Amino acid sequence: MPHTKKILVIGASIAGPALCYWLNHYGFQPTLVEKNQSTRKGGYAIDLRGIAVDVAKQMGIYDSVCAMRTSLQCVRYVDAAGNLLFEEHGEKGGFRQGDEVEIVRGDLVDILMKTITDIPCFYDHAIESLTQHDDHVTVQFKNGKTENYDLVIAADGLHSATRRMVFSKDDYHLRNLGCYISVFSIPNYLQLDHCETLLEAKQKLVSITSDKDSTKAFAGFMFRSSNSPNYIRDEASQKDFLRENFTNHGWESNKLLSLMNDANDFYFDAIMQVKMKDWTKGRIALVGDAGYTPSPLSGQGTSLALVGAYILAGELKTATDHVAAFARYNELLKPYVEANQAFGVWVSESFLADEPLSAEQAEERNNIVLGIMKKATHAIELPEY
């Protein structure tokens, strides 16, 4: 495929910058746009696992990722009264094996953005409309600007606006796994030292984690609920929903809820998967969570984003045209996506226990997780491009 192709990439999180790196590497002309005024800093910890580690090494970022990795030394399980039940040390609590690594989301975004400093990147650029033609796509931005591109690739996340513009409701389905997640920063008032402490009971999980910055910690909530619509988008309702589910739940729950309004990085979402037969239509493609999020519970969203970006760019490099490249992208990535989405469903059904786990029960569950995860994280053989 001619490498002079002008390609618009939408979304400056994980998949978007990774895709731009590979497109630029292969001689294409990518432009990256992001609707927000900057990349999001900080955030929760994410993982590079399985073959995604190989992609990171090929990109030359693996050493940088390792240098910025989290450094949790233990995970402590407590009961509702705050009594220590047991603790795990090293990588065991994070389900990482071999050269797999955990890093804060914002740190990985910074590393990826540093690989594409020579690529045009525009912030505060939201898309108003996309119009496909035989030989190009016309993009109307909300700031009034209009541009034509040979291809458009959207990496704008689970709630992708591009997906809603381009694909009909018959083309995709958001599968709610019946769980919800929330994360926000708090002062490290428990003075945790490279440690995560958590309470898992009544199909709910509350955690406090402090890693590199000893003054700061992150509060985490995960829970099952059938009493909410799939889509709660306003922050006030999200916080009310958390209070309904965690007030007087035990341990530090009430304290964390009281600190919630002071956080400037509050995050909440339903745990969902994007289910699609194909991630392409005409001259437009989806990559990462926009097309195939496996759910945060799987811990594989970042890995799917990196692998998906690698394969999509590689197929565009080797194919005769975008039609052939998109067809191969859909075909090659499908088994990997399906394996990791199945893993995400299994986790949603197997975690968030009714009663606090014993050390033996946690050990048994961890071993099962590691076995299933190893298969899912290697459910594709990386092509060489």
Curated annotation (Swiss-Prot):
GO terms for biological process: response to antibiotic. Inhibited by anhydrotetracycline. Its EC number is 1.14.13.-. Gene3D superfamilies: D-Amino Acid Oxidase, subunit A, domain 2 (3.30.9.10), FAD/NAD(P)-binding domain (3.50.50.60). Keywords: Antibiotic resistance, FAD, Flavoprotein, NADP, Nucleotide-binding, Oxidoreductase. GO terms for molecular function: FAD binding; oxidoreductase activity. Binds 1 FAD per subunit. InterPro entries: FAD-bd, FAD/NAD-bd_sf, FAD_aromatic-hydroxylase. FAD binds at residues 12-15, 34-36, 44-47, 105, 267, 289, 296-302. Its cofactor is FAD. It catalyses: 7-chlorotetracycline + NADPH + O2 + H(+) = (1S,10S,10aS)-3-(CONH2)-9-Cl-1-(Me2N)-3,3a,4,10-(HO)4-10-Me-2,5-dioxo-1H,10aH,11H,11aH-cyclopenta[b]anthracen-6-olate + CO + NADP(+) + H2O; a tetracycline + NADPH + O2 + H(+) = a (1S,10aS)-3-(CONH2)-1-(Me2N)-3,3a,4,6-(HO)4-2,5-dioxo-1H,10aH,11H,11aH-cyclopenta[b]anthracene + CO + NADP(+) + H2O. Pfam families: FAD_binding_3 (PF01494). It is an enzyme of class 1 (oxidoreductase). Belongs to the aromatic-ring hydroxylase family. Isolated from an agricultural soil sample. Tetracycline antibiotics bind to the ribosomal acceptor site (A-site), preventing binding of the aminoacyl-tRNA to the A-site. The hydrophilic side of tetracycline makes many hydrogen-bonding interactions with oxygen atoms of the ribosome's phosphate backbone. An FAD-requiring monooxygenase active on tetracycline antibiotic and some of its derivatives, which leads to their inactivation. Expression in E.coli confers high resistance to oxytetracycline, slightly less resistance to tetracycline, moderate resistance to minocycline but no resistance to tigecycline. Degrades tetracycline and oxytetracycline; the reaction requires NADPH. Degrades and confers resistance to chlortetracycline. Consists of an N-terminal FAD-binding domain with a Rossman fold, a substrate-binding domain and a C-terminal helix that bridges the 2 domains close to the antibiotic-binding site. This last helix is flexible, is not found in TetX of Bacteroides species, and may contribute to their different substrate specificities. This is Flavin-dependent monooxygenase. It comes from Unknown prokaryotic organism. The lineage of its organism: Bacteria, environmental samples.
